[in-house]
A protein has these predicted regions:
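Mature extracytoplasmic or otherwise solvent-exposed domains
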Residues: 1-200
Length: 200
């Protein structure tokens, strides 16, 4: 059995982990299928940030299942991104990536476990410069995250599948004797989850 889910049913936007006053602009609209953010380091002193924004959907394993079964999930998405990292006698980090994560709940709605089952790197740079910078964009349509973990299914249990977008920056700011700066921005447009429950 299986199907296609074409819209997020859940949104998750936890507080951004940050230090040093970077510019942080969460821009997701999960109900329109969009995960989006902008991060920029503080110009005047050291700063860092890690942002997570997620959209999810539920899959219920039928109570009539027999034997050992597994859940297979493949998200399709379009994405675009822009990154900058530069410095003079300093280092800087910029990056963004996607993860596929599944939460399992029993028939009473109690959380059982969480499983990371996929990873897709959009862009990443962590470097030190005598003097230099790197600026680049990334993008593509109809990408799929290959599932690299097994999700054993229990009859009647609920499986909440999340597409997680992560963004990172870290830089030292700019001063008289050099410094560094970083920008990370990415937008992911969710297309669908293709899923199936198959014999293990």
């Amino acid at each position: 059995m299986g199907g296609i889910i074409r819209a997020f049913q859940w949104a998750f936007d936890p507080s951004v982990e940050q230090i040093g006053g970077p510019t942080v602009v969460p821009r997701s609209n999960q109900w329109s299928g969009v995960l989006d953010f902008f991060l920029q380091s503080n110009h005047d002193h050291g700063s860092a940030a890690h942002l997570l924004t997620s959209g999810g959907a539920d899959i219920v394993a039928p109570a009539t299942l027999r034997g050992a079964n597994r859940l297979n999930v493949a998200p399709t998405f379009n994405y675009s991104a822009f990154f900058y990292a530069g410095g003079v006698f300093h280092s800087a980090l910029t990056g963004a990536y996607l993860e596929l994560y599944v939460e399992e709940f029993d028939t009473a709605g109690n959380f059982v476990r969480g499983i990371d089952i996929g990873h897709f790197e959009i862009g990443y740079w962590d470097g030190w410069w005598l003097s230099g910078s790197r600026t680049w964009g990334a993008g593509g349509n109809s990408w799929v995250i290959p599932q690299n973990g097994t999700v054993a299914v229990t009859q009647g249990f609920l499986y909440r599948v999340w597409l997680d977008l992560h963004g990172d920056i870290r830089a030292d700011g700019w001063g008289v004797f050099g410094g560094s700066g970083a920008i990370s921005q990415a937008q992911v447009r969710f297309v669908q989850f293709d899923w199936s429950i198959d014999p293990a």
